[in-house]
């Protein structure tokens, strides 16, 4: 929690105003932030200075794992995070590759589970990683990559957190996640949860111990219409005791995650938080 608040304060104190062409808004911006989550000791990075809706973050991650490309499928899992980008993004609405209501195109999990090969066919990156780790193999390339410039034109949004690199040391699994851009008041709240949970769940289904998850953010920013509530409300609140995160021990394989797992298979204990803050979302 401290490292999150320190980053927020750093942006407020040291950030530079940058015009964002996509949203038409200014962002207070810093370059490079490195966060670490101690999954081994269940130090769950859930924000306490406002209410955090962790279930939606886990649901979104589960949708990525399943390779979903439709906002309706994400809603069925328990999150509306893709409704706006699928249905309110003007550029995507006018894109001839859009297949209709709720279509997201080839973004995030689609790339992770079905990366198109130039000679035909597709690569299931996640399956390869799971198979390797289960066999105690780390080829220094256990990388899940969502960033495919050749298909940006057939997706509603470029990936923000675009790379997840898993590494084995003995029987302990580590994760390095890289994010090109982060809406800190809204997005980082989700992304911290997802990085933590991704390592925890991958360790569980591959029979490994979770270690630390390392989260690099390149462009960390606060939109101009988010600055006042961040500076004047959230940063003035005292952080509360950290919660703990738990996963149903019956989840044992990638197939389990693809089929029967729901949000009921994840729970948080001891979550204390301040009141919610309604930060504006920029499409």
UniProtKB/Swiss-Prot annotation:
Pathway membership: Pyrimidine metabolism; dTTP biosynthesis
EC class of the enzyme, as a word: transferase
Residues that bind (6R)-5,10-methylene-5,6,7,8-tetrahydrofolate: 183, 282
Positions annotated as active site in the UniProt record: 160 (nucleophile)
Any GO BP: dTTP biosynthetic process
Molecular-function GO terms, alphabetical: thymidylate synthase activity
Family matches, as HAMAP family: Thymidy_synth_bact
Protein name: Thymidylate synthase
């Amino acid at each position: 929690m401290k490292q999150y608040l320190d980053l927020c304060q750093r942006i407020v104190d040291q950030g530079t105003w940058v015009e964002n062409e996509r949203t038409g808004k200014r962002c207070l911006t810093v370059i490079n932030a490195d966060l670490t989550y101690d999954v081994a000791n269940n130090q769950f990075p859930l924000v306490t200075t406002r209410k955090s809706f962790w279930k939606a973050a886990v649901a979104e991650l589960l949708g990525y794992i399943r390779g979903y490309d439709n906002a309706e499928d994400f809603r069925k899992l328990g999150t509306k995070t893709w409704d706006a980008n699928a249905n309110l993004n003007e550029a995507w609405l006018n894109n001839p590759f859009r297949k209709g209501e709720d279509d997201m195109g080839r973004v995030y999990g689609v790339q992770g589970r079905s990366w198109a090969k130039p000679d035909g066919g597709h690569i299931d990156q996640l399956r390869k990683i799971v198979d390797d780790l289960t066999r105690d193999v780390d080829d220094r390339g256990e990388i899940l990559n969502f960033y495919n410039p050749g298909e940006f034109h057939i997706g509603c949004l470029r990936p923000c957190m675009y790379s997840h690199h898993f590494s084995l040391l003995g029987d302990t699994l580590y994760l390095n996640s890289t994010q090109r851009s982060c809406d800190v008041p809204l997005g980082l709240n989700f992304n911290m949860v997802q990085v933590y949970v991704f390592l925890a769940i991958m360790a569980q289904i591959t029979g490994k111990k979770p270690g630390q998850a390392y989260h690099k953010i390149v462009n960390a920013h606060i939109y101009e219409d988010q600055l006042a509530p961040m500076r004047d409300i959230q940063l003035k609140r005292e952080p509360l005791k950290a919660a703990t995160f738990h996963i149903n021990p019956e989840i044992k394989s990638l197939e389990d995650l693809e089929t029967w797992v729901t949000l009921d298979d994840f729970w948080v204990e001891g979550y204390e938080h301040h009141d919610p803050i309604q930060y504006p979302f920029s499409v």
